[in-house]
């Protein structure tokens, strides 16, 4: 049988990213401190932060189009009328806006200020929607999905997509 599937080409551009740490030769030759490990760790953190920012908020100019970009980014997100106006219903709508095959392993992405607001959300019986991890390595969840924080996610404000889910 014939299917309705179609394919098209997408150009994935490469973008340059660099960082620099000045280290003296004296410090490099110091055997007491693992400077190479430290520098390597710092490179990883810096580049990781820049990539996280670009993949979330990038505008397509010398960086990828981020998932929060107004054109080419995510079509659906939690947007509110104002500060502290997120509702449980909006979160449920966001979860079910994602197709079922992708929903099971999806996570919420938000900043710490938004986490603080979500932790205060309650259901009709006064029970918190937020579920802290029961064991040491268990993640916190809301509506059964893990929460990931990013300093690059916008805060809750009128028109901002302050929560991503996917």
What positions do the PLM features span?
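Structured, hydrophobic secondary-structure cores that serve as assembly/anchoring elements
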Residues: 1-166
């Amino acid at each position: 049988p014939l299917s309705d599937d179609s394919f098209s080409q997408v150009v994935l551009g490469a973008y340059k990213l660099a960082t620099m740490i000045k280290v003296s030769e004296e410090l490099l030759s110091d055997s007491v401190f693992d400077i190479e490990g430290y520098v390597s760790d710092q490179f990883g953190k810096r580049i990781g932060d820049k990539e996280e920012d670009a993949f979330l908020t990038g505008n397509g100019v010398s960086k990828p189009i981020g998932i929060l970009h107004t054109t080419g980014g995510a079509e659906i997100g939690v947007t509110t009328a104002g500060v502290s106006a997120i509702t449980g219903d909006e979160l449920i709508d966001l979860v079910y806006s994602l197709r079922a095959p992708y929903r099971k392993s999806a996570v919420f992405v938000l900043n710490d200020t938004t986490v603080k607001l979500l932790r205060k959300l309650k259901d009709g019986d006064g029970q918190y929607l937020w579920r802290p991890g029961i064991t040491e390595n268990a993640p916190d969840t809301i509506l059964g999905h893990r929460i990931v924080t990013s300093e690059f996610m916008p805060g809750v404000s009128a028109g901002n997509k302050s929560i991503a889910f996917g």
